[in-house]
Amino acid sequence: MTQKATILAIFMVVLVLGLETKETQGQEMCHDLIKKTDCDDATCVTLCKQKWNGNGGGSCFQIVNLKSCLCAFPCQV
């Protein structure tokens, strides 16, 4: 009887882990670039939230003399 219970418990653990993995893999992130001449992280986060209805966030990065804001948000917005 204990062997059947062990096999059932292992099967249930694998099933639950498989269902959780399916839910976390479905969330894809999209990106958007806001080009600016100057950028700070607080302003960047605010701009991204305004543009994408409160979803996602942003961070600044610099390419040569141009600082830009890179927004990341769920693709289903």
UniProtKB/Swiss-Prot annotation:
Compartments, as annotated in UniProt: Secreted
Q: Which cysteines are joined by disulfide bonds?
A: 30-75, 39-60, 44-69, 48-71
Primary site of residence: secreted
Q: Which UniProt keywords apply?
A: Antimicrobial, Disulfide bond, Fungicide, Plant defense, Secreted, Signal
Q: Which Pfam families match?
A: SLR1-BP
Q: Could you provide one GO biological process annotation from this protein's UniProt record? A: defense response to fungus
**Keyword presence, Signal:** yes
What are the annotated GO cellular component locations?
extracellular region
Q: Does the keyword Signal apply?
A: yes
| Span of the signal peptide | 1-26
Q: Which InterPro entries match?
A: DEFL (IPR010851)
Q: Which family does it belong to?
A: Belongs to the DEFL family.
Instruction: State the protein's name.
Output: Putative defensin-like protein 120
Q: Which organism is it from?
A: Arabidopsis thaliana
